[in-house]
Amino acid sequence: MLKVNHIKKSFKQNAVLEDINLEINTGECLYIHGKNGCGKSTLFKIICDIIQTDSGTIEKKSDTYIGAFIENPGFIENESLRFNLEFLASINHHYNEERIRELCHMYSLDYNNASSLKNYSVGMRQKAGIIQAVMENQNLIFFDEPTRGLDEESIVVFENMVNTLVKKGRSIVIASHDRLAHVHYTHTYLLEEGKLQSEDN
């Protein structure tokens, strides 16, 4: 589905990623962990074409449709949840109100709440970020610290959603300090000192 080949990235001569190789196949769930600043977000941003790599390539199949929750998804702070989700989904002409309402209900967010997103709590914003990453039925999804700010009940909802999506053939990559005990990972990796190391037994 997607292949990362010999990716390197430095910032001001500080090497963050060194010769990163990774293959993601259909229906897999990958877990990447490492210390703060180890390069997890940078790797995701390169794969999602948000920033450029210094060298190396990304190969992906033509039918690969990427969804991602990496830091701020580009929400318009003065607008409502509904406006933001409709706006983001309409960019790629994949707006499906029934699907979005279903996800909002799943995460206990009021789709019709007229309040601006800037007034949302950290946890509510986190839920909105998760929703925008999956609402267009993307088939390859990247989550960077997805459970930050979530309560235990919402973490369980997230874990169940991930397992359900993987069963449906979606591919998911999670970068997190928390392993999320109920997610069924296919492969586990440690990102340390710019190197991505498999921890599969």
Segment roles from a protein language model:
Residues 72, 78-94, 99:
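Q-loop/switch helix immediately C-terminal to the Walker
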Residues 2-4, 17-19:
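Conserved structural motif at the start of ABC-family nucleotide-binding domains
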Residues 130:
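Hydrophobic anchor residue at the start of the ABC signature
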